[in-house]
């Protein structure tokens, strides 16, 4: 049985990862959160393995957490939301996005643990799409640059999954899906904004079923679904969730940050389900 520590379980990804591993008897999953207020979002039975008051930017707090849990695997789900002001503040973005992953990797190496770190397609500008792991980052904003610096490309005990996510948040509506479902009347659907990420529940499944069983995997891998326009994505979500809303096609935003994940498929055998199936899964696990 692998002991898994999820950092940041109140975030959109962390909550899905904790839930996925918690439902599998083959893993003993622990999680961290900054405030005890977040405990109410989790079932009573799982709270004994949730550690509140953990500040991941405090070295002593991290060391104490690792010493208590003694994990085999650490999954870093701590991160900033690009749409919020903090993502533009160097004093906030750099410690969390750029420095924390490297500090975690060093601590994990000392405790003989494997680190799974999550990065983003925002390390790319979106000018061309179909990006490979070998493509150079050309992000022009602080968020994208800081996430790139935080990637772990060549450490034997760490794997970086570069991807993008959609899903449901625990306590807010900053995400695309929650924002869309909260709207009334009509919204714009960008027909030339291309996305290739995964629902959080599917990315959590990828980690559990395709990354953990391959301890030899390290370095950088793209994990992606088939590219889809945001217009078509919103249309599928509206249909699956029974949302009555007008989605107006808009070609003004042209951006393609889609990732090529053939290397990950060759290494693990993983191939993402179709988008209708992915949206169905997201709805079923909300």
Enumerate the language-model features and the residues they cover.
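N-terminal Rossmann NAD(P)H-binding glycine-rich loop of SDR-like oxidoreductase domains
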Residues: 2-24
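Glycine-rich NAD(P)-binding loop of the Rossmann-fold in SDR/ketoreductase-type enzymes
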Residues: 57, 88, 92-103, 134-137, ...
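NAD(P)-dependent short-chain dehydrogenase/reductase
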Residues: 140, 152-195, 201-202, 209
């Amino acid at each position: 049985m692998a002991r898994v520590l999820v950092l940041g379980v109140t975030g959109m990804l962390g909550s899905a990862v904790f839930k996925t591993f918690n439902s599998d008897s083959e893993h003993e999953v622990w999680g961290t959160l900054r405030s005890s207020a977040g405990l109410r979002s989790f079932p009573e039975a799982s709270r004994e393995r949730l550690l509140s008051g953990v500040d991941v930017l405090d070295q002593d707090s991290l060391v104490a957490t690792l010493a208590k849990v003694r994990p085999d695997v650490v999954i870093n789900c701590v991160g900033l939301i690009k749409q919020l002001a903090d993502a533009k503040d160097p004093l906030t973005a750099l410690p969390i996005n750029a420095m924390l992953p490297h500090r975690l990797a060093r601590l994990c190496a000392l405790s003989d643990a494997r680190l799974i770190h999550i990065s983003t397609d925002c390390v790319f500008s979106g000018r061309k799409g179909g990006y490979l792991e070998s493509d150079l980052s050309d992000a022009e904003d602080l968020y994208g640059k800081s996430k790139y610096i935080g990637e772990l490309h060549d450490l034997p005990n760490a794997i970086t999954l570069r991807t993008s996510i959609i899903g449901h948040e625990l306590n807010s509506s900053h995400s695309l899906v929650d924002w869309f479902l909260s709207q009334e009347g009509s919204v714009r659907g960008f027909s030339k904004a291309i996305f290739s990420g995964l629902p959080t529940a599917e990315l959590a499944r990828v980690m559990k079923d395709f990354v953990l069983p391959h301890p030899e995997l390290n370095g950088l891998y793209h994990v992606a679904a088939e590219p889809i326009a945001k217009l078509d994505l919103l249309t599928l979500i509206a249909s699956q969730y029974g949302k009555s809303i007008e989605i107006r096609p808009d070609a003004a935003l042209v951006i393609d940050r889609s990732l090529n994940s053939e290397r990950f498929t060759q290494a693990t055998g993983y191939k993402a389900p179709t988008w209708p199936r992915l949206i169905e899964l997201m709805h079923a696990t909300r």
